[in-house]
Amino acid sequence: LASLAPGKDNPVIVIAVSEESATYKPEMDWLADRLQLMGHRVFSLHTNEVFPLGGGLYFDIEGNPEKIDVVYRFFELFDLANIKTSHFIIEAWENGEIALDPPLRPFFEEKSTLALFHHHLLREFWRESISKKSRIILDSLIPKSWIVDPSPLPPGAAIDGPLAQGRQLHSWMDLAEASQKERNLVLKISGFHETAWGSRGVVIGNDVSKEEWASSLTEACDRADSHLHVIQEFRKSIRLSHPLYSMDGEVYEASGRLRLNPYYFVNGDKVELAGALATFCPPDKKIIHGMEDGGDATVFCY
């Protein structure tokens, strides 16, 4: 983060934590305290503790305004409307008064972009744009994905997607008649929405009744103009054993499912894998995410 302010020997870095992310504030406080002991000027603040002054962005230290050089954004873009100081932060960044990281890249919120990788009209484009080695890796990582587009088709046309009763779809609502085996699919909302994170808007086809599946498909089609949905082949996460601490501090071996969230830093034209967040969840959870009964661990890459 300090490298984002190359003109400063010891820049002032603020970790700005929103109310929506407040459960992580104690961890950020701990991290900032440790970095301060190492001589770095790093501060963990709530987003409402920063304020504008003379075009720059500041916070209060014992009654004195301290100018901020770098803001680590610990808030989501979908939550901007609920953050009173967000326009001050963005304005200071636009004016070159602060560096902001992670960068504002809303396209990362769109699950629908995953469907573009498997789109039959884009196969030649990916062959020309991505190396064979990279395509093989991406093909193994990205499950087959389709955008739920309810636009009517000509009578002789079919959707390039999953099957229902062994037949191609003419409408996404045809998928309501799919067998339970064919419903090994997951329906997700894409983009900015309160249900688009934390698995709130996720429906696994063979895990709900036929009626619930049909209702979810109807909702996805009805909301296509404002909030796109995607359907993906459902893949279970890996199951493995890992040592955990019990409430009394004893170590025991537990079975669970693992999710890895990689974190990358972009330095100029170079992209570096900095680490990953490993989430170890109970084995009975089909949908895994940051949850109270799961354990998080940070994996650093050197």
Model-derived features: positions:
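Domain-scale recognition of functional cores that engage charged ligands
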Residues: L1-Y302
